[in-house]
Amino acid sequence: MIQMQTNLDVADNSGARRVQCIKVLGGSHRRYASVGDIIVVSVKEAIPRGRVKKGDVRKAVVVRTAKEVRREDGTTIRFDRNAAVILNNQGEPVGTRIFGPVVRELRAKNFMKIISLAPEVL
C-alpha cells in the first residue's frame, strides 16, 4: 500500500537508488497504490552517471509492497520492502535489468517487458 511521501527502493539499473511517491495516478482522490499501479515519483538518491538524476520527477510502477496482496485463489504475497521500476513516457522501463522478484499481477496489467527482464516472477 503506497501513498504520498512513501519511500521506495528502485528495482532496476536506471541509476536511481531510492524514490519518494509524490502522486498516485488513477482518479482525482485516489489515496493508495498497490502492485502494478503507476505512481509519480521524485528521485531522492541516485548513483553518478546514471540515466536518472537526483531531483528528477518520473513515473514508476510498483513491483513489490510490504502490504500483502491477496490473490484470486485466496493466497497472499508480501515482501520486506516496497520497490518500484522507473518508466519512460511510453510506459517502458528506463533500465535494462530488473533486480529481485516481481509479482505475476504485472502480467495482467501488460508490463510484459518487466516480466521478461525479472529474474523471478512470484
Curated annotation (Swiss-Prot):
Name the family the entry cites: Belongs to the universal ribosomal protein uL14 family.
Concerning HAMAP family, the annotation shows: Ribosomal_uL14
The protein in question is named Large ribosomal subunit protein uL14
Can you list the GO cellular component terms from the UniProt entry? cytosolic large ribosomal subunit
Mind telling me which InterPro entries this protein's record contains?
Ribosomal_uL14 (IPR000218), Ribosomal_uL14_bac-type (IPR005745), Ribosomal_uL14_CS (IPR019972), Ribosomal_uL14_sf (IPR036853)
**Record has Ribonucleoprotein as a keyword:** yes
- Source organism superkingdom: Bacteria
Segments traversing the membrane: none
Mention one GO molecular function.
large ribosomal subunit rRNA binding
**What Pfam families does this protein's entry cite?**
Ribosomal_L14
Subunit details = Part of the 50S ribosomal subunit. Forms a cluster with proteins L3 and L19. In the 70S ribosome, L14 and L19 interact and together make contacts with the 16S rRNA in bridges B5 and B8.
Tell me the function of this protein.
Binds to 23S rRNA. Forms part of two intersubunit bridges in the 70S ribosome.
Q: Which UniProt keywords apply?
A: Ribonucleoprotein, Ribosomal protein, RNA-binding, rRNA-binding
The residue range of the signal peptide is none
- Gene Ontology biological process terms in this record: translation
